Amino acid sequence: MEKTMEKAEDLQAAPPSLGKKPDWLKVRYNQEATEEVAALMKDLRLNTVCKEANCPNMGECYRKHTATFMILGSVCTRNCRFCNVSCGRPEAVDEEEPMNVAKAAKQLHLKHVVLTCSTRDDLEDGGALQFAKTIRAIRELCPGTTIETLISDMKGRTESLDIVLEAKPEVLNHNVETVKELQRAVRPQAAYERSLGVLRYCKQHSPDIRVKTGFMVGLGETEEQIDRLMDDVLETGCDILTIGQYLQPTKEHYPLARYATPEDFARYKKNALLKGFHHVASAPLARSSYRAWEALEDVHGLY
Protein backbone atom coordinates (compact mmCIF):
# COMPACT_ATOMS: atom_id res chain seq x y z
CA MET A 1 0.00 0.00 0.00
CA GLU A 2 1.37 3.39 -0.98
CA LYS A 3 1.48 6.07 1.67
CA THR A 4 2.03 9.80 1.75
CA MET A 5 4.20 10.78 4.65
CA GLU A 6 6.78 13.26 5.90
CA LYS A 7 9.83 11.25 6.85
CA ALA A 8 11.25 12.53 10.11
CA GLU A 9 14.77 11.48 9.27
CA ASP A 10 15.07 13.52 6.09
CA LEU A 11 12.36 16.17 6.17
CA GLN A 12 12.93 17.86 9.49
CA ALA A 13 10.34 20.10 11.07
CA ALA A 14 10.72 23.69 9.99
CA PRO A 15 12.56 26.01 12.38
CA PRO A 16 10.04 28.18 14.26
CA SER A 17 11.15 31.30 12.39
CA LEU A 18 10.26 29.72 9.04
CA GLY A 19 6.77 28.64 9.99
CA LYS A 20 5.13 25.43 8.78
CA LYS A 21 7.06 23.27 6.34
CA PRO A 22 5.61 23.71 2.82
CA ASP A 23 3.32 21.07 1.37
CA TRP A 24 5.51 20.72 -1.72
CA LEU A 25 8.18 19.02 0.41
CA LYS A 26 5.95 16.05 1.25
CA VAL A 27 7.03 12.78 -0.32
CA ARG A 28 5.42 9.49 -1.29
CA TYR A 29 6.87 6.03 -0.91
CA ASN A 30 5.96 2.41 -1.45
CA GLN A 31 7.01 0.36 1.54
CA GLU A 32 7.11 -2.98 -0.28
CA ALA A 33 9.38 -1.72 -3.08
CA THR A 34 11.61 0.07 -0.57
CA GLU A 35 12.08 -3.06 1.51
CA GLU A 36 12.77 -5.21 -1.56
CA VAL A 37 15.59 -3.00 -2.84
CA ALA A 38 16.97 -2.51 0.68
CA ALA A 39 17.09 -6.29 1.18
CA LEU A 40 19.06 -6.75 -2.04
CA MET A 41 21.58 -4.10 -0.98
CA LYS A 42 22.00 -5.80 2.39
CA ASP A 43 22.52 -9.23 0.82
CA LEU A 44 25.29 -7.86 -1.40
CA ARG A 45 26.83 -5.71 1.37
CA LEU A 46 26.19 -2.52 -0.58
CA ASN A 47 25.38 1.03 0.45
CA THR A 48 23.06 3.46 -1.29
CA VAL A 49 23.34 7.20 -0.97
CA CYS A 50 19.54 7.09 -0.92
CA LYS A 51 19.65 5.68 2.61
CA GLU A 52 22.94 7.02 3.96
CA ALA A 53 22.17 10.63 2.94
CA ASN A 54 18.44 10.32 3.74
CA CYS A 55 17.38 11.41 0.26
CA PRO A 56 13.75 12.58 0.10
CA ASN A 57 13.32 10.84 -3.27
CA MET A 58 14.26 7.40 -1.95
CA GLY A 59 10.69 6.14 -2.09
CA GLU A 60 10.10 7.10 -5.72
CA CYS A 61 13.40 5.70 -6.91
CA TYR A 62 12.95 2.43 -5.01
CA ARG A 63 9.43 2.14 -6.40
CA LYS A 64 10.96 2.31 -9.90
CA HIS A 65 13.65 -0.21 -8.90
CA THR A 66 16.48 2.29 -9.21
CA ALA A 67 19.14 3.27 -6.72
CA THR A 68 22.34 5.27 -6.49
CA PHE A 69 25.14 3.04 -5.26
CA MET A 70 27.55 4.55 -2.74
CA ILE A 71 30.88 2.79 -3.10
CA LEU A 72 33.92 2.94 -0.82
CA GLY A 73 31.89 2.43 2.35
CA SER A 74 29.35 4.45 4.31
CA VAL A 75 31.84 6.45 6.41
CA CYS A 76 33.29 9.70 5.05
CA THR A 77 36.61 11.33 5.93
CA ARG A 78 35.06 14.80 5.69
CA ASN A 79 32.44 16.43 7.86
CA CYS A 80 30.46 18.75 5.59
CA ARG A 81 27.85 20.56 7.65
CA PHE A 82 24.96 19.92 5.26
CA CYS A 83 25.48 16.17 4.83
CA ASN A 84 23.97 13.29 6.78
CA VAL A 85 26.63 10.71 5.85
CA SER A 86 28.66 9.61 8.89
CA CYS A 87 32.16 11.01 9.35
CA GLY A 88 34.98 8.97 10.86
CA ARG A 89 37.61 6.37 10.05
CA PRO A 90 36.51 4.36 6.99
CA GLU A 91 36.91 0.62 6.63
CA ALA A 92 39.25 -0.98 4.12
CA VAL A 93 38.15 -0.93 0.50
CA ASP A 94 35.94 -3.94 -0.31
CA GLU A 95 37.51 -5.76 -3.26
CA GLU A 96 34.22 -7.56 -4.00
CA GLU A 97 32.23 -4.33 -4.14
CA PRO A 98 32.59 -3.60 -7.89
CA MET A 99 31.17 -6.98 -8.92
CA ASN A 100 28.47 -6.83 -6.23
CA VAL A 101 27.31 -3.47 -7.58
CA ALA A 102 27.18 -4.95 -11.06
CA LYS A 103 25.18 -7.94 -9.79
CA ALA A 104 22.67 -5.61 -8.12
CA ALA A 105 22.36 -3.50 -11.27
CA LYS A 106 21.69 -6.64 -13.30
CA GLN A 107 19.13 -8.00 -10.84
CA LEU A 108 17.30 -4.65 -10.78
CA HIS A 109 17.39 -4.45 -14.61
CA LEU A 110 18.82 -0.94 -14.45
CA LYS A 111 19.25 0.97 -17.69
CA HIS A 112 21.16 3.81 -16.00
CA VAL A 113 23.38 3.35 -12.96
CA VAL A 114 24.61 6.16 -10.72
CA LEU A 115 27.76 5.61 -8.66
CA THR A 116 28.72 7.95 -5.87
CA CYS A 117 31.06 7.60 -2.92
CA SER A 118 32.00 8.66 0.54
CA THR A 119 34.97 11.03 0.29
CA ARG A 120 38.12 8.99 0.95
CA ASP A 121 40.96 11.40 1.67
CA ASP A 122 42.73 8.46 3.34
CA LEU A 123 43.29 6.80 -0.04
CA GLU A 124 46.10 8.03 -2.28
CA ASP A 125 43.87 7.96 -5.37
CA GLY A 126 40.77 9.18 -3.53
CA GLY A 127 38.96 6.01 -4.55
CA ALA A 128 39.39 6.52 -8.29
CA LEU A 129 40.47 2.94 -8.96
CA GLN A 130 37.38 1.56 -7.21
CA PHE A 131 35.22 3.74 -9.46
CA ALA A 132 37.01 2.39 -12.54
CA LYS A 133 36.70 -1.23 -11.40
CA THR A 134 32.98 -0.77 -10.71
CA ILE A 135 32.36 0.81 -14.10
CA ARG A 136 34.11 -2.08 -15.84
CA ALA A 137 32.19 -4.67 -13.79
CA ILE A 138 28.89 -3.07 -14.80
CA ARG A 139 29.97 -3.02 -18.44
CA GLU A 140 30.71 -6.74 -18.16
CA LEU A 141 27.40 -7.80 -16.59
CA CYS A 142 25.10 -5.10 -17.97
CA PRO A 143 26.11 -4.24 -21.54
CA GLY A 144 24.11 -1.30 -22.79
CA THR A 145 23.58 0.17 -19.33
CA THR A 146 24.72 3.79 -19.08
CA ILE A 147 26.77 4.92 -16.09
CA GLU A 148 27.03 8.16 -14.17
CA THR A 149 29.72 8.84 -11.57
CA LEU A 150 29.25 11.38 -8.79
CA ILE A 151 32.79 11.84 -7.52
CA SER A 152 34.48 13.73 -4.71
CA ASP A 153 37.06 16.37 -5.64
CA MET A 154 39.81 13.75 -5.06
CA LYS A 155 41.85 16.66 -3.71
CA GLY A 156 42.08 17.96 -7.26
CA ARG A 157 44.62 15.29 -8.26
CA THR A 158 44.46 15.02 -12.04
CA GLU A 159 45.99 11.54 -12.02
CA SER A 160 43.00 10.33 -9.98
CA LEU A 161 40.53 12.07 -12.27
CA ASP A 162 42.25 10.44 -15.26
CA ILE A 163 41.62 6.98 -13.79
CA VAL A 164 37.88 7.65 -13.66
CA LEU A 165 37.76 9.34 -17.06
CA GLU A 166 39.64 6.48 -18.74
CA ALA A 167 36.87 4.10 -17.61
CA LYS A 168 34.52 6.24 -19.74
CA PRO A 169 31.33 6.80 -17.77
CA GLU A 170 28.65 8.54 -19.81
CA VAL A 171 28.29 11.26 -17.15
CA LEU A 172 30.86 12.71 -14.74
CA ASN A 173 29.25 14.60 -11.87
CA HIS A 174 30.94 16.62 -9.15
CA ASN A 175 28.88 18.99 -7.03
CA VAL A 176 29.87 22.52 -6.08
CA GLU A 177 27.07 22.27 -3.44
CA THR A 178 26.73 25.98 -2.60
CA VAL A 179 27.75 29.48 -3.62
CA LYS A 180 31.36 30.62 -3.29
CA GLU A 181 30.63 32.84 -0.30
CA LEU A 182 29.28 29.95 1.83
CA GLN A 183 31.84 27.28 0.95
CA ARG A 184 34.00 27.58 4.06
CA ALA A 185 31.01 27.49 6.40
CA VAL A 186 29.13 24.68 4.64
CA ARG A 187 31.95 22.36 3.50
CA PRO A 188 35.16 23.50 5.21
CA GLN A 189 37.36 20.69 3.86
CA ALA A 190 36.50 21.44 0.24
CA ALA A 191 37.18 24.47 -1.96
CA TYR A 192 35.08 26.27 -4.58
CA GLU A 193 37.92 26.81 -7.04
CA ARG A 194 39.05 23.21 -6.67
CA SER A 195 35.57 21.98 -7.55
CA LEU A 196 35.43 24.25 -10.58
CA GLY A 197 38.84 22.92 -11.55
CA VAL A 198 37.57 19.34 -11.40
CA LEU A 199 34.68 20.17 -13.74
CA ARG A 200 36.92 22.09 -16.12
CA TYR A 201 39.61 19.39 -16.26
CA CYS A 202 37.10 16.61 -16.90
CA LYS A 203 35.42 18.47 -19.75
CA GLN A 204 38.68 19.54 -21.37
CA HIS A 205 40.26 16.08 -21.21
CA SER A 206 37.13 14.04 -22.00
CA PRO A 207 34.88 16.27 -24.12
CA ASP A 208 32.69 13.31 -25.08
CA ILE A 209 31.67 12.78 -21.44
CA ARG A 210 28.73 14.82 -20.16
CA VAL A 211 29.84 16.89 -17.17
CA LYS A 212 27.36 17.69 -14.44
CA THR A 213 27.18 19.59 -11.16
CA GLY A 214 24.61 20.72 -8.64
CA PHE A 215 23.98 23.05 -5.75
CA MET A 216 21.48 23.65 -2.96
CA VAL A 217 19.48 26.73 -2.07
CA GLY A 218 18.19 27.65 1.36
CA LEU A 219 21.56 28.03 3.05
CA GLY A 220 21.53 31.83 3.13
CA GLU A 221 22.75 32.59 -0.39
CA THR A 222 21.60 35.65 -2.33
CA GLU A 223 20.16 35.81 -5.84
CA GLU A 224 23.30 37.60 -7.06
CA GLN A 225 25.50 34.86 -5.62
CA ILE A 226 23.42 32.17 -7.34
CA ASP A 227 23.77 34.02 -10.64
CA ARG A 228 27.56 34.24 -10.27
CA LEU A 229 27.75 30.55 -9.40
CA MET A 230 25.91 29.65 -12.60
CA ASP A 231 28.32 31.78 -14.62
CA ASP A 232 31.36 30.21 -12.94
CA VAL A 233 30.08 26.68 -13.54
CA LEU A 234 29.09 27.36 -17.15
CA GLU A 235 32.60 28.65 -17.86
CA THR A 236 34.00 25.20 -17.04
CA GLY A 237 32.05 23.64 -19.92
CA CYS A 238 29.57 21.90 -17.63
CA ASP A 239 26.56 20.47 -19.51
CA ILE A 240 24.03 19.55 -16.81
CA LEU A 241 22.96 21.47 -13.70
CA THR A 242 20.82 20.38 -10.76
CA ILE A 243 19.33 22.78 -8.20
CA GLY A 244 17.45 21.60 -5.11
CA GLN A 245 16.24 22.68 -1.69
CA TYR A 246 18.57 22.21 1.27
CA LEU A 247 16.87 20.16 3.98
CA GLN A 248 18.59 20.29 7.37
CA PRO A 249 19.11 16.62 8.41
CA THR A 250 19.29 17.33 12.16
CA LYS A 251 19.54 20.35 14.43
CA GLU A 252 23.30 19.75 14.58
CA HIS A 253 23.69 20.43 10.86
CA TYR A 254 23.99 23.74 9.04
CA PRO A 255 20.88 25.85 9.77
CA LEU A 256 18.16 26.18 7.17
CA ALA A 257 17.71 29.82 6.13
CA ARG A 258 14.65 29.62 3.87
CA TYR A 259 12.38 27.51 1.74
CA ALA A 260 12.60 28.42 -1.93
CA THR A 261 9.25 28.20 -3.69
CA PRO A 262 8.47 26.17 -6.83
CA GLU A 263 8.31 29.53 -8.62
CA ASP A 264 11.86 30.27 -7.46
CA PHE A 265 13.08 26.99 -8.89
CA ALA A 266 11.30 27.63 -12.18
CA ARG A 267 13.08 30.99 -12.38
CA TYR A 268 16.47 29.41 -11.64
CA LYS A 269 15.88 26.86 -14.41
CA LYS A 270 14.87 29.50 -16.94
CA ASN A 271 17.90 31.62 -16.09
CA ALA A 272 20.31 28.67 -16.33
CA LEU A 273 18.94 27.56 -19.70
CA LEU A 274 19.19 31.10 -21.04
CA LYS A 275 22.82 31.19 -19.94
CA GLY A 276 23.55 28.09 -22.00
CA PHE A 277 23.29 24.94 -19.86
CA HIS A 278 22.05 22.01 -21.94
CA HIS A 279 19.88 20.46 -19.23
CA VAL A 280 18.68 21.86 -15.90
CA ALA A 281 16.81 19.98 -13.17
CA SER A 282 15.54 22.61 -10.75
CA ALA A 283 12.89 21.70 -8.17
CA PRO A 284 12.49 21.58 -4.38
CA LEU A 285 13.28 17.86 -4.19
CA ALA A 286 15.77 17.73 -7.07
CA ARG A 287 18.98 15.95 -6.13
CA SER A 288 22.12 15.03 -8.05
CA SER A 289 20.98 11.59 -9.14
CA TYR A 290 17.21 12.06 -9.14
CA ARG A 291 15.88 11.10 -12.60
CA ALA A 292 19.46 11.21 -13.82
CA TRP A 293 18.58 9.17 -16.90
CA GLU A 294 16.30 11.98 -18.09
CA ALA A 295 19.21 14.43 -18.16
CA LEU A 296 21.35 12.00 -20.12
CA GLU A 297 18.56 11.42 -22.65
CA ASP A 298 18.10 15.17 -23.00
CA VAL A 299 21.74 15.86 -23.87
CA HIS A 300 22.44 12.58 -25.69
CA GLY A 301 22.09 14.12 -29.13
CA LEU A 302 24.64 16.85 -28.44
CA TYR A 303 27.72 14.73 -29.12
Per-region residue spans from a language model:
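Small/polar loops that bind or transfer phosphate-bearing groups
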Residues: 71-72, 149, 282
